[in-house]
Amino acid sequence: MPNHPLAPTDPRGLLRRRTVLKAAAGASLPGLSTAVWAAGSDKPEKEEVRIGFIPLTDCASVVMASVLGFDKKYGVKIVPTKEASWAGVRDKLVNGELDMAHVLYGLIYGVHLGLGGPKKDMAVLMSLNNNGQAITLSKALADKGAVDGPSLAKQMAKDKREYTFAGTFPTGTHAMWLYYWLAASGIDPFKDAKVITVPPPQMVANMRVGNMDGFCVGEPWGHRAIV
């Protein structure tokens, strides 16, 4: 059978594919490229960029880029702003108070799709963390032998009461991990347990006063709960 005119073995097809890909890449930044070349300058579109972050280990790339002056090389000034909650980050991204943010993948998809709030186009520019979160159970549960999913399920079946767990944002990665982990252990996260939203820096304090039985959050808060 003869090769298709645009099959990978045909140099013309490969060249056309590369041309299309280059055109698509250029089209993804229409405002920036137009502004730059219309002015005949390589100046950044913005000289000061406000980047929101939540105090988690994976915010280090953003914060240290500012502290060590890596931004100066590109003619911009990074202004890192410490935020209190993921909901606050979402709202500031939507209303323009923040130019970009260290943020949960699920949160960005939620905003892009208009889930749980206003809809606004979003783009993920880079990954700062691959996994890195932990599920932590209270010392009271651990003392009763609940140290993993199966033993937690046994304890919940034995001691019938309301069990409360926390994630950091309804459409966030931590909530997804928590739901999946509970379900995999035979615990219905929507019927057998109560799942609440708590900002990462407040997880340990809420655990200490008995407001929750466990939580899922990014580091260093899981480690802080242990030490």
What label would you give each PLM region?
Residues 1-15:
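N-terminal secretory signal peptides
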Residues 4, 19-38:
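N-terminal export signals
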Residues 17-18, 179:
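Short, cationic motifs built from Arg/Lys/His that form the positively charged side of catalytic pockets
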Residues 39-190, 194-196, 211-226:
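Short, glycine-/small- and polar/acidic-enriched structural segments
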Residues 197-201:
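Active-site glycine-rich loop that binds ribose-phosphate moieties when present
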